[in-house]
């Protein structure tokens, strides 16, 4: 397993350390190789929002759509990218922290989002405990994979 984990690399790789799973809700931390501190999340919606914010901050993978609305509402504030390089341009110069060895209390997933197109994400999700890699073509499918794998651990029908 360690050999397969050591080969797991992407500049936008996010680790999802699941510490608690109950009734389809996940709680844990998001980690990445460019920051030593983790970002806590409380539920799947919070997880998705924080992952989206991280991708926007990196400007990678680039999104193909922007939020819009016909009525006034609180607008999502995209991180200020003025004067900053995109992640692929600066990844070689950033300090990197090891994340592959970190584990969640219940489960660990590493997510490589390759594209953010058609208002959703596409990529691969790697389940550390099962040594399994699953492709996903939408955020919903990614969440379904995570839920299925977590229910498998609890002995529920997947």
Where do the model's predicted regions map?
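Intrinsic disorder/low-complexity detector
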Residues: 1-16, 24, 51-119, 148-158
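N-terminal leader and targeting sequences that precede the mature domain
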Residues: 14-18, 25, 37-41, 46
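Mixed-charge, glycine-accented linear interaction segment located at domain edges/termini
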Residues: 38, 42, 48-56, 122-158
């Amino acid at each position: 397993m360690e050999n397969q984990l050591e080969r797991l690399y992407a500049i936008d790789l996010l680790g999802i350390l699941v510490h608690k799973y109950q009734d389809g809700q996940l709680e844990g931390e998001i980690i990445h190789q460019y920051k030593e501190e983790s970002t806590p999340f409380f539920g799947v919606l919070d997880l998705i929002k924080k992952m989206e914010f991280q991708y926007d901050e990196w400007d990678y993978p680039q999104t193909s759509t922007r939020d819009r609305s016909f009525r006034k509402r609180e607008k999502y504030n995209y991180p200020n990218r003025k004067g900053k390089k995109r992640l692929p341009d600066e990844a070689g110069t950033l300090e990197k922290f090891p994340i592959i060895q970190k584990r969640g209390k219940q489960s660990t997933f590493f997510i490589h989002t390759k594209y953010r197109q058609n208002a959703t994400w596409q990529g691969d999700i790697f389940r550390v405990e099962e040594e399994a890699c699953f492709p996903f073509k939408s955020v919903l499918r990614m969440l379904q994979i995570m839920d299925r794998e977590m229910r498998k651990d609890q002995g529920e029908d997947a």
